[in-house]
Amino acid sequence: MSRKIQRKEQILDAALHVIVQNGYHQSRMDDIVSTSGLSKGAIYWYYKSKKDVYLDLVNHWVIRYSNSLLELPKEDISAGKQLNNLFETFFNQFEKDPIVFKALLEFWSLAGRDTEFNIKLEKVTHNFIQYIESIIKKGVESGEFKQVNPNIAAMSIMVVIEGISWFTLFEKNSVSAKEYIETVFEFILSGLLKRIES
């Protein structure tokens, strides 16, 4: 990893912790400087403003998630298994870095008020829905799934996955994130699978 990439990751990691702690509007570049341990000059070498940092933070996590999804097996595997792997990937990420999901709530809030964040997150969401949609289409075409609207099914799954974020807000929940993921996956899969008539 080059020094430039290391520095940017150090800055973005600090920015992630700052936005979760303070929220976007209460965060300052000085907070990112102190959390990162780098000089102010080093931060401004890469980013001109707080907004630039956080827009790049979205890119950073999109690339990381995209790489994780691309590594999931696609050939010689059923659409149902692909969906299961997708849910497991997001749960594992939640277990590893719940702070990312907490930051996501802040970004969604920003998207409702800021055009640049809105455009950025809309593109991210669109790409992810397309990915899920391709799995649904595969299941429909193979006869594994019912004749459903792939786009609507994909959007529904997207909303369910985003629901993991709410587990970062409350320390005490009547159900665990794992139980939530497993249960809703069963609901979704049972709704998609084509019934075999006896």
Regions from the PLM with identified roles:
Residues 10, 18-52, 56-57:
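Helix-turn-helix
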